[in-house]
């Protein structure tokens, strides 16, 4: 179980894990690794005086209304549910529909007070293998601050068909003095990719540092 895993690894996870202000007014609900990016942005915003949080769903099936109700802050006024899929023909994406139904179920069964009536909006992110960046996560929180938040939006892709994508500041970055980032450009067959792959392996194996690399190839031939 998760408790045993935590004791063995030092990493403790819950099926429904909330991170953020205990009295958050804006909450993002999502699954997957993108939640960690959103948590970092939430921490930044909380230090700036906002009241936000992130609820990570690690157990989608069976979905536990009780665990969800225990994890969600009852101070939430706006909840954004992010799905990494587009469900054509449905009223919303799977997690969005699950959260909306769970809030209603929890209120009817007494797990949440009937006064708990947040605005629940849905969004899609990282579609088409797009990156999900801190700038996009901040855009999601900014959308919740609007007088009329955009619902069923996309972030990261400019939706010129339905015009339902939200804008964000692409220059926004989370600066961490303990992190070193670098961008390397190379031409075809010049050895840049191979050299960087070996560099990352050396850093990861021979030092106590954590290393990550991401490579992008265009269609031009060498």
Where are the regions that the model predicts?
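Conformationally flexible catalytic loops at phosphate/diphosphate-handling active centers
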Residues: 1-18
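Generic recognition of flexible, low-complexity loop/linker segments
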Residues: 13-18, 67-69, 169-174, 182-184
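Solvent-exposed alpha-helices and their adjacent loops that cap or buttress functional pockets
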Residues: 18-23, 71-74, 111-114, 147, ...
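Anionic-ligand anchoring segments at beta-strand to alpha-helix junctions in alpha/beta enzyme folds, i.e.
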Residues: 29-58, 178-222
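Short glycine/threonine-rich loop-to-helix capping motif typified by GTGT followed
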Residues: 32, 42-43, 63-74, 92-94, ...
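Core nucleotide-handling region used for phosphoryl-transfer chemistry
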Residues: 48-78
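A structural-propensity feature for long, helix-poor, extended segments
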Residues: 68-87, 215-222
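Peripheral docking tails and interdomain loops at the edges
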Residues: 78-175
């Amino acid at each position: 179980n998760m408790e045993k895993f935590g004791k063995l690894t030092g990493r403790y996870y819950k099926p429904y894990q909330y991170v953020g202000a205990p009295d958050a007014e804006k909450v993002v609900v999502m699954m997957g690794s993108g939640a960690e990016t959103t948590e970092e942005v939430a921490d930044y915003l909380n230090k700036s005086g906002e009241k936000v949080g992130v609820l990570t769903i690690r157990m989608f099936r069976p979905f536990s209304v009780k665990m969800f109700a225990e994890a969600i802050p009852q101070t939430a006024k706006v909840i954004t549910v992010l799905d990494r899929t587009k469900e054509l023909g449905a009223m919303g994406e799977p997690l969005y529909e699950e959260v909306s139904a769970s809030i209603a179920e929890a209120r009817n069964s007494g797990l949440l007070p009937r006064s708990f009536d947040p605005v629940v909006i849905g969004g899609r992110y990282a579609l088409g293998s797009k990156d999900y960046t801190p700038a996009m996560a901040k855009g999601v929180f900014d959308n919740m601050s609007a007088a009329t938040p955009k619902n069923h939006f996309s972030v990261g892709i400019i939706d010129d068909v339905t015009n339902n994508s939200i804008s964000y500041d692409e220059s926004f970055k989370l600066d961490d003095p303990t992190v070193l980032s670098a961008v390397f450009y190379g031409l075809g067959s010049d050895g840049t990719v191979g050299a960087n792959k070996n560099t990352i392996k050396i850093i990861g194996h021979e030092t106590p540092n954590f290393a990550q690399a991401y490579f992008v190839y265009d269609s031009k031939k060498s």
